[in-house]
Swiss-Prot record:
Biological processes, Gene Ontology terms: translation
UniProt-annotated stretches for the region Disordered: 127-153
CC terms in the record's Gene Ontology section: cytosolic large ribosomal subunit
Protein name, UniProt field: Large ribosomal subunit protein uL3
Molecular functions per Gene Ontology: rRNA binding; structural constituent of ribosome
Family under the similarity heading: Belongs to the universal ribosomal protein uL3 family.
Alphabetized Gene3D superfamilies for the sequence: 3.30.160.810, Translation factors
C-alpha cells in the first residue's frame, strides 16, 4: 500500500458536525496520480514508487521527460517519490486515487509556505521591537544588539535577523481526515495546510500518529 499521494490545495472552508459544531477544514484535490516509475533495491538501492500529478501541455515537456513518461502513457506536471509497503502491487501506468485514505485517519501534509519577501525581525521572528517613546525615533522595529564587541568580534551563526521570509518546505503533522469525495478526488482535512491556493502538496500517512 502506498504511503502518500500528490495533490493541490484548493482552499479553506468550514463544515458542520452532527452536533452542530463548526470545523475549519482545508480542501485538497488529491490525485488522481499515475505511477511513472518503480524504484527497486537491485537497481536503485531502495524501494519507492514515483507518482505523477497534474496536466501539462506537450510542448512544455522536454523530450527526455517525454521518453521517461512514455511507459506511463500520460504527461504529468509534477513527479515525486513515495514509500510503499509492497512494491510488487504496483505497475507503471497504474492510477492512484484518494481512496488510499480513510475518514478519521491521521495524515501529514507537506507544502511550500507563502513567500513573504524581505521581512524584518518583528514579522519574521516575532520580536517586540523597541519602546515607542523615551527618545526613540527610528528604532521601533529594530532588532537591537546582534553581539558583543572585540570578543568574539563577529556575529554568531543562526543569529535571528531580517531576511527573506517564507517559500520554505513546511510539514504539518497529525491532521485528521474529515471527509472524502471519491468522485471529485477531494479530501477535507481538519485545520490549515501550508502554501497558497493551487499549491502542490504531498499528503501521506502520519509518521508520528497519536492515539486518543
Amino acid at each position: 500500500m502506498l504511503n502518500g499521494i500528490l495533490g493541490r490545495k484548493i482552499g479553506m472552508t468550514q463544515i458542520f458536525t452532527e452536533k452542530g459544531e463548526t470545523i475549519p477544514v482545508t480542501v485538497i484535490e488529491a490525485g488522481p496520480c499515475v505511477v511513472t516509475q518503480l524504484r527497486t533495491k537491485d537497481k536503485d538501492g531502495y524501494e519507492a514508487v514515483q507518482l505523477g500529478f497534474g496536466e501539462i501541455k506537450p510542448r512544455k515537456v522536454t523530450k527526455p521527460i517525454q521518453g521517461h513518461l512514455k511507459a506511463a502513457g500520460r504527461l504529468v506536471r509534477f513527479m515525486r517519490e513515495v514509500k510503499t509497503t509492497d512494491l510488487n502491487a504496483h505497475n507503471v501506468g497504474d492510477v492512484v486515487n484518494v481512496d488510499i485514505f480513510q475518514i478519521g485517519e491521521k495524515i501529514d501534509v507537506v507544502g511550500t509556505s507563502k513567500g513573504r519577501g524581505f521581512a524584518g525581525v518583528v514579522k519574521r521572528h516575532g520580536f517586540r521591537g523597541g519602546p515607542a517613546t523615551h527618545g526613540q525615533s527610528d528604532r521601533h522595529r529594530a532588532p537591537g544588539s546582534i553581539g558583543s564587541g572585540t570578543t568574539p568580534g563577529r556575529v554568531w551563526k543562526n543569529m535571528r535577523m531580517a531576511g527573506r521570509m517564507g517559500n520554505d518546505r513546511v510539514t504539518v503533522q497529525n491532521l485528521e481526515v474529515v471527509k472524502i469525495d471519491l468522485e471529485r478526488h477531494v479530501i477535507l482535512v481538519k485545520g490549515s495546510v501550508p502554501g497558497a491556493k493551487n499549491g502542490l502538496v504531498m499528503v501521506s500517512r502520519a509518521a508520528k500518529a497519536t492515539k486518543k
